[in-house]
Structure formats: C-alpha cells, structure tokens
C-alpha cells in the first residue's frame, strides 16, 4: 500500500499571507451565505467569521457582478479570499484581476485548453493558487460510467486528471478537495488522495446537514481523516450560520491538539453531587474564552470530587460547591471564592494568564528579531 503523505510533508502553497501545507498549521475555512455582489452584506459576514476565528473565506461567483465586487470586498477584509468559479473562465479572470487570493475551479470543466491556459497564466502572474474541487456528487460522466457509481478510486482519478491539466501547463500551486456527503466514502477518498499525490488537501464533508446532525457527521468523518495526519485546511459544512461552522472547526482542531491559538474548556458531566448551576456557568465560560487566542485550558467542575485533581492539566479552573468554590491552577487550590463571584474571579484569572502568554510571545518575537 502506498504511503500516506502526512500533512507536514505536503507542498507549501501561498494563499494571501498564509502558507498552506508543509509544516504549517491546519487552517479553518468557511463560506459566505450572501450574494457576493452585495458588498456591504458580504463584508459584514466575513468580519463576523474573522472574529469567530475563520482564517480563509470563500465566496460564490456565479455572475459577472459578483466577480466585479471582489476588489471592493478585498479592501475591507483581513483574511485571504477564495473565489468559487464554475464553468465560466472569464469570471475567474475577473476575480483574479480583482485580487482573489485563491481560485476554486476544476480546469476540466471550463472548456477548451486555451481557456485553461488563460486562467493559469493569470494565476501565475499574480501568484494565486488553484483549488481543484472534486465532489462525489458531480464526477465526470466517463468516470461514473467506468466505476458505476461514485467511488474513492473514481474521485482520485478525477483529481489526478485535473492535476495533470495544470501540471502540463507547469502550474503547481495546487490545493485539492475530495468531498462527499457519505462519511466512509470521504475517509477512503482522502486517504487514497494522500497516497496518490503530495499537494495540500482541503477537508470537508459536503451536505453534512443541520447544526446538530452536521456537527456530529463532520466530526466523525473529518476526525477520522485528521487522525491519519491528513488535511491542511478544513471547512465544516452546515445548514446554519457560517459562524457555527467556524466554532465547530475550532473545537475539532482543539480536540486533536492542532489549534495553538485557542482556549479550551474542560467541564464535567452533571450528576447528583452538583450544587451549582454547572450548565449555565460552563456555557458562560465557554462563550467568554471563545475569542481568546491563547492556548489555555480552562476547567469548570461541579464539585470538589472532580476538582481540582481530575483537571490537573487545566491552567485555571473552578470547582463549585454550595455557597463557595475552589479556584485552582494546575491541579492546586489557589483560594476559596464566594459562589456569587467565582465566575467573575475565574474570568479575571483567565485574562491574566492570556496577558502573560501574549507578553511572552511578544518577547520571543523581539528576541528572534534581534538574532
């Protein structure tokens, strides 16, 4: 069996100010739900996604007016912009001219070779990569005829076909996705893709469903793929506010220790020993740390039985009891706090730890700059 190309051994590809692949972190992506030509609405949604932790955003581009809006959108956002093109190569050219950071296009679907050459030439001139988007639901007719139905081998064959078109034009800034709505098919397709080539892979389970069902399905599929060391960017596709996609993606990365810039909550399940409103407190703390870009582990425990000993890996936490709680760090009690103020005191300690982390990071940057 061919060896899987680990995410850290994939080709590095520049997307705006980010580098995808190589030794770089797995990056979170989402997609807007707005009409792209509505610049105000699109920018507003992208800024909400940015705030939630989205690192790359994709927009639809079915019409010329959408492509013409790219330049104005780019002026107002801070993260790389991917433009989704289907069939019409002229829209790709307009988007590239407008400042797109990446183009999502299947070169085999946009017509004659000279059209592909024009897109590739424009991407080369601007240093823009191309994402080849293979989808089990839209495989080429000849591949479906060969395999009878969507298969992992058929998806890899489709990817290699599109890759060869670009490679024949001496273009190698390529990212590939192998999306399917069937979890087992997606796992097999991504595994075989990682064995077939070393281009970075964008992960996704397409059409995964609503917020609850889609979260479970995406976590099951993408978690299995990520556990193999596969994947350089990911999108959680949900029938929900795209901000929820980003939240789920962040939690998934944290679960695998792949998010160095996010705080993590540890909280115990409820039981009859609990004498505080654990669920409300845990939700409040989770919301509070959701925008903290520091690798802190924060624990919220319902009683002294579970804490602080059982959460000794946490940087900071509280264990509740009737009328008071224990504030602890690294498994050791720091002090007792009144129940009515323990959440606020926990937040203050979280802020202190985050500030210490940021100062340390800044000092390290200065030290490295002086070398």
UniProtKB/Swiss-Prot annotation:
Pathway: Isoprenoid biosynthesis; isopentenyl diphosphate biosynthesis via DXP pathway; isopentenyl diphosphate from 1-deoxy-D-xylulose 5-phosphate: step 5/6. Transmembrane segments: none annotated. [4Fe-4S] cluster binds at residues 268, 271, 303, 310. InterPro entries: Dihydropteroate_synth-like_sf, IspG_bac, IspG_bac-typ, NO2/SO3_Rdtase_4Fe4S_sf. Keywords: 4Fe-4S, Iron, Iron-sulfur, Isoprene biosynthesis, Metal-binding, Oxidoreductase. Pfam families: GcpE. Its EC number is 1.17.7.3. Binds 1 [4Fe-4S] cluster. It catalyses: (2E)-4-hydroxy-3-methylbut-2-enyl diphosphate + oxidized [flavodoxin] + H2O + 2 H(+) = 2-C-methyl-D-erythritol 2,4-cyclic diphosphate + reduced [flavodoxin]. GO terms for biological process: isopentenyl diphosphate biosynthetic process, methylerythritol 4-phosphate pathway; terpenoid biosynthetic process. Disulfide bonds: none annotated. One of its GO terms (molecular function) is 4-hydroxy-3-methylbut-2-enyl-diphosphate synthase activity (flavodoxin). Its cofactor is [4Fe-4S] cluster. Converts 2C-methyl-D-erythritol 2,4-cyclodiphosphate (ME-2,4cPP) into 1-hydroxy-2-methyl-2-(E)-butenyl 4-diphosphate. HAMAP family: IspG. Belongs to the IspG family. This is 4-hydroxy-3-methylbut-2-en-1-yl diphosphate synthase (flavodoxin).
């Amino acid at each position: 069996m061919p060896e899987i190309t680990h995410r850290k051994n994939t080709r590095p590809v520049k997307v705006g100010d980010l580098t995808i692949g190589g030794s770089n972190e797995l990056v979170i992506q989402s997609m807007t739900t707005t009409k792209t030509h509505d610049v105000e609405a699109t920018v507003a949604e992208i800024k909400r996604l940015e705030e939630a932790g989205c690192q790359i955003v994709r927009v639809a581009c079915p019409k010329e007016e959408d492509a013409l809006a790219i330049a104005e959108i780019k002026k107002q956002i801070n993260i790389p912009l991917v433009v989704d093109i289907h069939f019409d190569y002229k829209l790709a050219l307009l988007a590239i001219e407008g400042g797109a950071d990446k183009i999502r296009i299947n070169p085999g679907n946009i017509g004659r070779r000279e059209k592909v050459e024009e897109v590739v030439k424009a991407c080369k001139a601007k240093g823009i990569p191309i994402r080849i988007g293979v989808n089990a639901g839209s495989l080429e007719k000849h591949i479906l005829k060969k395999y009878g139905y969507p298969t992992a081998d058929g998806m890899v064959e489709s990817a290699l076909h599109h890759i060869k078109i670009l490679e024949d034009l001496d273009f190698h800034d390529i990212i590939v996705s192998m999306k399917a709505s069937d979890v087992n098919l997606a796992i097999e397709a991504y595994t075989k893709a990682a064995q077939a080539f070393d281009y970075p892979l964008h992960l996704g389970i397409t059409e995964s469903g609503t917020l609850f069902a889609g979260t479970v399905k995406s976590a099951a599929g993408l978690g299995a793929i990520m556990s193999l060391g596969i994947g350089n960017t990911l999108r959680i596709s949900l029938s929900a506010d795209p901000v929820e996609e980003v939240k789920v993606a962040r939690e998934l990365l944290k679960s695998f220790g792949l998010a160095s810039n996010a705080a993590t909550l540890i909280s115990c399940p409820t039981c009859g020993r609990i004498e505080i409103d654990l669920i409300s407190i845990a939700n409040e703390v989770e919301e509070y740390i959701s925008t903290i870009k520091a690798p802190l582990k924060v624990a919220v425990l319902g009683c002294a039985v579970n804490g602080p000993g059982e959460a000794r890996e946490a940087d900071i936490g509280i264990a509740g009891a009737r009328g008071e709680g224990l504030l602890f760090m690294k498994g050791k009690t720091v002090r007792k706090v009144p129940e009515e103020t323990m959440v606020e005191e926990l937040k203050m300690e979280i802020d202190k730890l985050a500030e210490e982390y940021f100062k340390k990071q800044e000092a390290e940057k200065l030290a490295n700059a002086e070398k």
